[in-house]
């Protein structure tokens, strides 16, 4: 499995863990152990990313929800558990994993929403995380926009 696929799979498994935690209320340790035991390919996953995402998200749910809640325009309780889990993971990664470009974080969240969420869930996730990235990573977002604008002017 390529390193890119190992990271994507780590995000999928972290999503499963957060989703399981939201529905079951089990401790983060129980959830982590269950996900590891159930994933037949866990030995090929980027374990460091999986642990960082799952533990970091579950240890900071309240603070992460506070970050994205201004952009959802409805009570958090009305989100589907899968959308909530994806937003929690994406918010954590935007905030605490700055080595990963914001566009990669958002794209990976969109792919998770397409694979596991409702019909238009990916659009919702994209909109929320895009606004959040502009706030959490304003320098990176502005640099990307300036580069795009400069490229558009050269045509």
Curated annotation (Swiss-Prot):
GO terms for cellular component: cytosol. The keyword Cell membrane does not apply. Signal peptide: none annotated. GO terms for molecular function: RNA binding. Keywords: RNA-binding, Transcription, Transcription antitermination, Transcription regulation. The keyword ATP-binding does not apply. GO terms for biological process: DNA-templated transcription termination; transcription antitermination. SUPFAM superfamilies: NusB-like. Pfam families: NusB. Involved in transcription antitermination. Required for transcription of ribosomal RNA (rRNA) genes. Binds specifically to the boxA antiterminator sequence of the ribosomal RNA (rrn) operons. NCBIfam families: nusB. Belongs to the NusB family. HAMAP family: NusB. This is Transcription antitermination protein NusB. It comes from Azoarcus sp. (strain BH72). The gene is nusB.
